[in-house]
Regions:
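Amphipathic alpha-helical "coupling" segments that flank catalytic cores
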Residues: 1-186
Length: 186
């Protein structure tokens, strides 16, 4: 954090390294600022993903009101940083990279762990879309198409809303409904 930045400067570290050290705890909550530097952004995402993967690998997962390691907040922070900075990155690749840094005996079933962590992020992206004012049906539609790239998922939601409010959408929906009904009868 802040003291780490001061120590890094005192030890002659590059200014970007020192700044990344101070930014790696950001965001601390939903309304907090995001890291300003690319280095701080990468370090913060990596640190939070490492914590989430490590906890899931150890069998420590949030349940109901229990989240002693603030994993939901850390996942929401990852989502906020990726979306807020418009980063085009694969969530699955970030998870896989974090898993690769753990010994096999800790990870166990790496594929199963990756799926569990990926599914954990689904509710975070749903919450973000809901907080941005998207309706339930729009959220369902865009999440059903996948959310591996969080920035694209939010852009997809905006595009669905834009298209949904046009006459063409109604015509396409009617045509699809007719074709779907005919296919059921065949």
């Amino acid at each position: 954090g802040l003291m780490g930045e001061k120590y890094a400067y005192a030890q002659g570290e590059h200014p970007l390294t020192a700044k990344a050290i101070s930014e790696h705890y950001l965001p601390k909550n939903a309304d907090d600022e995001l890291p300003l530097t690319f280095e701080g952004l990468v370090l913060s995402i990596a640190d939070k993903m490492d914590t989430i993967v490590g906890c899931f690998a150890a069998g420590i997962e949030p349940t109901g009101s229990q989240d002693p390691y603030a994993l939901r907040r850390q996942a929401a922070g990852i989502c906020s940083m990726i979306i807020g900075r418009g980063v085009l990155v694969s969530l699955k690749a970030l998870i896989a990279q974090a898993i690769d840094h753990y010994p096999a005996e800790i990870v166990g079933d790496a594929e199963g762990l990756a799926e569990k962590v990926y599914a954990f992020f689904e509710q975070r992206i749903r919450n973000i879309l809901n907080d941005q004012g998207y309706r339930y049906d729009v959220i369902e539609a865009v999440v059903a198409c996948g959310y591996d790239n969080l920035t694209e998922t939010v852009l997809r939601a905006a595009a669905v809303v834009k298209v949904k409010n046009t006459d063409t959408f109604g015509q396409l929906l009617n045509a699809f409904t007719r074709a779907n009904n005919l296919a059921k009868k065949a």
